[in-house]
């Protein structure tokens, strides 16, 4: 009951900021939502520049149960298709139900500028629909991203979401946040990597995100992380079977509780 009351109080916030970059995939979610330097199919969401490092066609599907409430569940689908000149990606993300449906579909592209620098872009179509004949509003946003690899152990990622500060509806001031992420990933060994990122929404304080991924034995990954403002710890694991990757994570909000995530990746 207390959680539902808090959700009710915070619902205007979700309505206003629902079209930002929601966490997807299950892998990054287990590492404090640090995904800037991860080259898998979900790079279409976190850093399109990392798509350029993919070598095969990849698919992804995920579901996140935000605060264990079905009405706030996040569904996402993704595909990445490498070509000789770069990698194209397509992603759909939706959250809500019949009364409130917030969705985003985006087309992205990542290319190599050199052996050490990748560039990425993405265009999104946003749609917010309110039930009971309250109508629908929509708009288009852009994303820009970079990935630098100064050494074999260090990667530096940058991602800018909605740099033009586009709104869903100027009349009702329905905003789509403008968000910047900057991060570093360090490969301690073949079994351990660590990520540190800083996120800044122009309307909110800085958030620091940290995560680690450990590969103790074949076919198993263990993950943990934390993000600030508010402080949200997370844990997760990944299982590998052939070309399939199953990722599970769970994050804990101090007031609203658990948010489990499940993702499946497949590469041809």
Model segments located where?
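Subset of outer-membrane beta-barrel
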Residues: 18-268
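Sec-dependent N-terminal signal peptides
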Residues: 4-14
